[in-house]
Each structure stands twice: as C-alpha cells, then as structure tokens.
C-alpha cells in the first residue's frame, strides 16, 4: 500500500543503495525520480510524503599531477613512433587544452578545426548544443603538424585509427591507457583530463567558473560547481594565459620536423 510508506522506508532504500556501491550521483538520480513521483501522489491525495534529494559529501576529484602531465606531454620521436602513439600524444594535448569529453574527441572532424581562427567547433555534444572552443598557441602548432601526417578529407574524423576510421569508445580509452602506462603514469582514466583541466584552469591559470562552464559545455553553473568553487577573473585575458596546455608548455621548445627523406 503506497499510502503506508514512511520516510524510514525511503531512508532504508537509500542505505541499501549505498551499501550496494552506487555512487552519490546514481542515488540522487533515483531519489529525484521518486521525488517527482511522490509529488504527483501528494497532489492526488494518495500520500503526504516529502522526499528530499540525497545529499552526499563533496569529495575532491582526482586529477593528474604536474609531474604526471609533464611525462604525458613529452613528445614521442616521430621518426621512431607509430601513428597511433603519435595520435595519442596529440589527443592528450587536446584534452588538456579543451577539457573535452571522450565522446566529443571521437566526434571532431577535420573540418571542425579552424587553425587560422584558433578554435575548434563541437557539433556533437552531450547536451546537443554546438560549442566553439579556443585553441592555445601550442595546440595550434601541434595540430598543424599532426594534420600534415594525418592527411584525410574535411569530413574525416580528426583522431582516427591507423586505417582512417573513427575511434571507438573503448578503442580511445584503451589507447589513452596504453599511452599513460608507456609514460610511467599509473592513472589511466581519460575523464581525469577533464577534471585536471577544470582544476588547472581555475587554480593555476586564473580562469573563472562562468567561462569554465562554457568551456566544459555545462548547461548550468551548478554542474560546474562540482568541479570548483567560484573564482573572479578578467574574461578579456588572452587564452594563452588561461589554457592549461599553454601553462604546462610555457618556455618550451618549438616543434621540430624531421628532415625530409628520412
């Protein structure tokens, strides 16, 4: 009998979900659905039960350390590496410049990158809203070089397999994991680059939460608050002052192409 339900019953359900290993976000999703359902029940006079959303303690999101990033950003020797290994290094740089989701990285096409304008267009995003993301100077140089090796048509995927096809979700994750392990970094999560981008953008690069919201493609600022507290910043500063990639590469050597014929 739904009318016999008490708050204690719902508390017990939350405890059972927590004991089953569900994440706070998953538990919140379930309680949000129940809250909507019982709001309707209350309107119909079936119950008088108010369900608060599950509140969990905010935990600090794991990120890559500067030492780990330095190892991951070390450029492979193009004369000795495979295309896949070189591509993975470019993707690592792209993730740290843009804070992209893995699905977005897979969806970017060659035509979406405007190197002269210094931006990349996201046409396929989680919230189905197109985005324009700035590229810092080091990222532009890296993509120019990558484009010369990658080749392809404008509608081809920017980050492809060695046969030119789109990377699968598992293929991308496995490639990044292998790259990290080759560099001696035990963390292998591609999503950690998104967390790292958010932390470094705000703390190390002086960015602000409102601009970060746009860069991460969050629909509301509340979503961005899961990554950070709000910081004030000058929105007119050059993106090179904000980009985590530019900050890591400050003072670094320019890209050198191998001699022709080798």
Model-derived regions: residue spans:
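Conserved catalytic core of the tyrosine transesterase superfamily
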Residues: 1-262
